[in-house]
């Protein structure tokens, strides 16, 4: 097992930033014992050596620049810092391009059609099949096999398998994992005289709290959830109550299951009672936006949202995190989890450089730094200790505790097709146009037809 660091790392990537810093510190330490003239000379020599090291790396990288596509602006600062380390070591420059989720896949599809995909980009379980079946992604299988730094067994197998097309071609390297937790407004709880959420909470406790936290004038609601928020929203309670979205063999829908109907009905009943904003409000405002504005007391949200929520002044002053409630009957407290992958265009003009970046981003060093900076929960095993400390004002441990009972985000070859259909049809349940049971029957029929055509 080859790990990052030591002589092996230096041979592959050149001097690390840490090594340069240590060398610089040593030079400064010696200089402090010299005369002013000698100190100046030592400083110039130090600068010269640093410049030569940087220049050597740039020459090794050929001055090339990789285009990197992501959709989350909150992760850009941390990823830039990590990629700067990569550039210092290899000379290969990177340019991150941020396209919001709503336009990201349209941008990629246009790039794939026009032959102008970014060199390296994020891949998702929703979309991997589309790009895999049309051979749009660089096959990393042999490169991973020959790598002396990547340790694929350190990543969750379910995440690795998402990006292993038909069980053979590895088309992406895991970037992260995510879990779901409960965010709550401590100030609102205090005003209502309600104890903060903890591991004893059931969904019934949650419902009772939502009722007490709702103000009759519409200025404050107990919670909020959108029909489009599947992984971080309604999916978790569906699985807690014994339901599911898609069967394990990915051949049939789970919307005819008693637990699925029960979980969704639980939520829509609370909406009908007025304990959550009506559909027309959540259609225009994301849950986190309402939470940050002090309009709702509770939301469920993914760990990927930490940079936004934890850096919001209102949230910092008033809110905290707890594990999700559990089902009173089954005792289940499930978190739907997922993980992004680093992929490259099959037609990139810089396949070796793209691979080097992906290899680096999947290394223990980069994965550790990603966690340390609080960007996300890294996928590499054993790198989460410092992630918990990245936002000390909040109970980040709740997200790690949710890893105890996790279910991979539902997906198949046509995920986006049936996911969009589900989102559209759930609107009728959210706004009360149809009963939740009737909507589930409609979804079941259409989803099974879609799965049969995969």
Which ranges hold each PLM region?
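Glycine-centered hinge/linker elements that transmit conformational signals in sensory
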Residues: 209-212, 250-280, 324
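Long, aromatic- and glycine/proline-rich binding clefts that accommodate carbohydrate-like moieties
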Residues: 161, 322, 372-420, 424, ...
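Hinge/lid segment of periplasmic solute-binding proteins
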Residues: 56-60, 126-181, 318-322, 388-392, ...
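Extracytoplasmic/periplasmic solute-binding protein
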Residues: 166-175, 180, 190, 204-253, ...
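Extracytoplasmic/periplasmic substrate-recognition and gating elements
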Residues: 64-67, 84-89, 93, 168, ...
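Short, solvent-exposed loop/beta-turn-alpha elements that line the ligand-binding surface or hinge
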Residues: 59, 141-155, 199, 223, ...
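A structural signal for short loop-to-beta-strand junctions that line the ligand-binding cleft
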Residues: 110-111, 116-119, 148-188, 221, ...
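Extracytoplasmic "Venus flytrap"/periplasmic binding protein-like
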Residues: 85-155, 191-193, 290, 294-298, ...
